[in-house]
């Protein structure tokens, strides 16, 4: 990631990434922003940057990454594991991202559409 960002910056481009949920334990949004990434898609990697007392997400033993609905449900629960809004850690992360001119594009509407589609299929 760092090499790609470095090359991108050499030619004067901004950059964005979709952080893979399987990799954000090792490389979260703060790592990317500090390396020079200028924006992120969705929000994967942001709760992990906001963790206070853990590095690894606390997923249940039956977590199934291959099941999109299960993955979205459990990913949404990561916010409960993150620092509380406006706490010192939360403010420090947000302040650093702002100081790095980092942009977040959460793209939440697709989650609602996917949820509604799956709910409609259950009732067929």
Segments predicted by a language model, with ranges:
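Acidic/polar, glycine-anchored loop/turn motif associated with catalytic or activation segments
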Residues: 110
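Accessory carbohydrate-binding/adhesion or oligomerization-edge regions at the termini
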Residues: 113, 117
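Histidine/acidic residue-rich metal-binding segments in metalloenzymes
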Residues: 1-106, 118-120
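Conserved small/polar residues in nucleotide/adenosyl-binding loops
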Residues: 122-124
